[in-house]
Structure formats: structure tokens, C-alpha cells
Amino acid sequence: MLRKLLLLLMSCIIFLTRRSKAAAAASASKTLVWGPGLETNAVLPARFFFIQTVDTTGTNFTTSPGENTFEVKITSPTEPYARIWIQILDRNDGSFLVRYRMYASYTDLHVEVLLKDKLVGKSPYVLRGAVYHESCDCPEPDGALWEKNMHCPASFSQIESDLSIFQSVDPDRNAHEIIQRFGKSHSLCHYTIKNNQVYIKTHGEHVGFRIFMDAFLLSLTRKVKLPDIEFFVNLGDWPLEKRRASQNPSPVFSWCGSNDTRDIVMPTYDLTESVLETMGRVSLDMMSVQGHTGPVWEKKINKGFWRGRDSRKERLELVKLARANTAMLDAALTNFFFFKHDESLYGPLVKHVSFFDFFKYKYQINVDGTVAAYRLPYLLAGDSVVFKHDSIYYEHFYNELQPWVHYIPFRSDLSDLLEKIQWAKDHDEEAKKIALAGQQFARTHLMGDSVFCYYHKLFQKYAELQVTKPKVRDGMELVEQPKDDLFPCYCARKKVRDEL
């Protein structure tokens, strides 16, 4: 009798297990597919869209269904061999990020998402008309329409704040005053964009970083016609304008801001280049991070983690703190440049660690370098929780971040860091919730489309403040668009304008 009951129980367990597995199977018809990479006019260096796996009951997967669950094909009816590189990144939360880089322009692209040879969602998705690749010089003449196509927000609070201190901007005055104030002791780029052509004159000795700004301006002007505008970009680490709002400050664009300066903040050169070179020269970008988040939360190492160079005293103190508290912190220096290397205090230099391997650890410690640490966007995009200290420095998105929502704050002198790490250990679910909120923030606000939107809105709003006409000044040179002789594109927009 007992044996019969056991056999009956085992049969029930097997039946329920099979039923559970059947219910958990991914559904081709219910799985969701969306994103700007399915839209013709959302032109980016690497286009992207998302897949959310949904099972047959309509429930979203929250863990990976398997790295090779989906297949994506992108074809053009007019070109049998489309030059398009596709990558499917498993985000380990039931969703996938699909990114693709086009090396030529095509007409009527067809995007098929397949699950075991079955079309997923509303596949095939058809991008009607001319679909332009990154190097195609074909700007949308209507800035408002371009913003609509890119789904840009109506405003950015940091832009509103930065420009609020300027009632007007006088390019004629700035052309003399800014050079006189900053041109000799700092490195500046003086830009004029006229008829959507980029002109530049550099000031100062170390102007190599102009390549980042040049490249982005050329990319942006290939996509949308910018208003005529004249402005200065600070190529150094530190923001420059220390005058108060009441002291008639000069408008200087910088990659980093601070509480004691009045610079106009742009997305950092690091984030900007990673957008331009996604699936290109760089391996670390806002998309690649999402596919390399390491072990799931429960299997991550319960320690704080940091690697970097000695560009701030607090970084040295962090390493000393870690050496005295090895159970809580793993922090080490990879290079000495600013301070004397005292191995008895700071330990030996260690080898560089792949950024993706950072996410083997549950707690990511973000400490300023010379200014704000430009790694923060990538740390947020992982699925570890970020610890960020109080700082006078900020990037273009910091005012949208909330402590205890998107990251765990600690004091700049590190005096409460161990206490905060212990809190995270004792409140694991709350720490995980903060990690996921930070990750969602990065996915929503720091992707390539958001970076392009930010720059365009900044230039548009700044141009509206100009009270004299931007000019191509003496000594300026044209920054020419690169030629793509191998795969030149045919711009339908230019043909329409020529016929008007």
C-alpha cells in the first residue's frame, strides 16, 4: 500500500513538473519586441531593440531562458548580401538587447526575430524607405521632427539649470573674452557650426582631445541640421568658469561640472565615444555591459570592489581601508602617477581587471578621480549595487540620480563606507532593489539615443540665447566629413531639397 502511494505521489510530481515546464516555455506569439532599432528614422551608430521573453501563460521571464534562445535576421529585398553585423546580448533577466551596426544604407529593411524557427511578436518588422547607416551624410532638416523620431524628452533638467544663468549669449563678445580669460592657460576648442558645417580653432597646448568632440559633431550633423551656433569647449578635466551668476559668467562647455563652477555640462567624452564606437573600436559601452553582468545576484561575491589609478587621495585611503578589512573590501591600485608608490601602505600594484569582471562582486565602489569618475554609467548598467560618495563634481545626469533609490551614498572621507557595506549585507533584498533601479536608470537615460538627444537639445537651447550671429572666425578650419568611397549613400532628403 505504501509503495502504491509513493508511486502515485511520484507520478503526480512528474506530471506537475512537466506541466510547470510546459507553462514556463517561451511563447513566440506573446514575447515582446520593441525599441528604436525597429524604426527607420532613429539613426544611430549602432541601432538597438529589445526582446522580453514571455511564456505561454503571458508571464514575463525574469531569468535567462538561455543565451541562444532567439535568432535575428536583418535583410533587404534590394540587397541580397546586406553588410550588417548583429549581436544578441542576454541581459540575464529574461530580456535581450539586440544591437546591429550597418556598414551601408538600405531600403525597406526586414527584421525577423525567431524562436525555434517561429516568428516572434509581430515579426517581420519592416523599416520602410531609406535606412541610413552611421557614415551617411543625410541630415533631417527639421530639428523638431528629428527629436520626435528619436523620442527625445521635452527637456533635460541639467540643461535648463546650466543655461538659466544666461539671459543672452553674445558670440562676438565671447570670441574675445573667453580666449582672453582661458585661451593661454587652458586647452579650448572654439567651434562654429554654420549651415550645418563644423569649423574649429584650437587654443592652448594640449588639444588632442578635440578628436572626441569633432567626431561627435560630425556624427550629429550627419543626422540632423543644427542651428547656426558658436561655442567654446573646455578640453581639460576641471570645469573653468568660477564667476557667480551675478558676475556675468562666460559660457564654457565642459564634460564635467562642479558645485563651485558655472560650466555648461555635456555628456563625457568617454560616454560619447563609446556611443560612436559601439561595435567598433571600443569593447566597453552601455550595451556591451548589459550582456556581461556576471553571476546572478545570489552568486556574486559579498564584497565591495574597486580598481583604478591613484588620481585622488581618497582612492589611496580606500586601498588602505581595504587592506585592513579584507572581508569587506577588495580595492587595489593598477597604476601610480600622481602620488609616490609606498607599497607598505598601499600594497603592490595589481594587473588590470576586465571591467566585465567587476560584476563578479555585489558592491561596486565609485570614487572620484581627478573629477567625477566617468565609469559610473557603466557601473549602473550592471546588476551590482553602486556605492557613490558625496562629491562637488557631477556629470550631465547626476541630478536625476537619487541616493538610496539608484545608489547607496557614503561620505567622501570614507568614514561610513564599511557601515554602508554592512547595511547592504544585512538588507540584501533592499540592496538588490537599489541595484536594479540603478540599472533601469542607466538603460533608460544613458543609452546612445539619449546622448544624441541631450546634445541636440543643448545646442538648440543655447542657439536660442544668441544675440549676435555666429561667425566663421579668422583662423578657423573646416572639420570635414569622412568620405565613404566604398559604400557611399544616396540621400533622398537632399534630392527633395534640390528639387524644391
From Swiss-Prot:
A motif (Prevents secretion from ER) lies at residues 497-500. Keywords: Endoplasmic reticulum, Glycoprotein, Glycosyltransferase, Signal, Transferase. Its EC number is 2.4.1.-, 2.4.2.-. It catalyses: L-seryl-[EGF-like domain protein] + UDP-alpha-D-glucose = 3-O-(beta-D-glucosyl)-L-seryl-[EGF-like domain protein] + UDP + H(+); L-seryl-[EGF-like domain protein] + UDP-alpha-D-xylose = 3-O-(beta-D-xylosyl)-L-seryl-[EGF-like domain protein] + UDP + H(+). GO terms for biological process: nervous system development; protein O-linked glycosylation via serine. InterPro entries: CAP10, Filamin/ABP280_repeat-like, Filamin/ABP280_rpt, Ig-like_fold, Ig_E-set, O-Glucosyltr/Glycosyltrsf_90. Filamin repeats lie at residues 23-128. Glycans are attached at N60, N259. PANTHER family: KDEL LYS-ASP-GLU-LEU CONTAINING - RELATED, PROTEIN O-GLUCOSYLTRANSFERASE 2. Belongs to the KDELC family. Protein glucosyltransferase that catalyzes the transfer of glucose from UDP-glucose to a serine residue within the consensus sequence peptide C-X-N-T-X-G-S-F-X-C. Can also catalyze the transfer of xylose from UDP-xylose but less efficiently. This is Protein O-glucosyltransferase 2. It comes from Danio rerio.
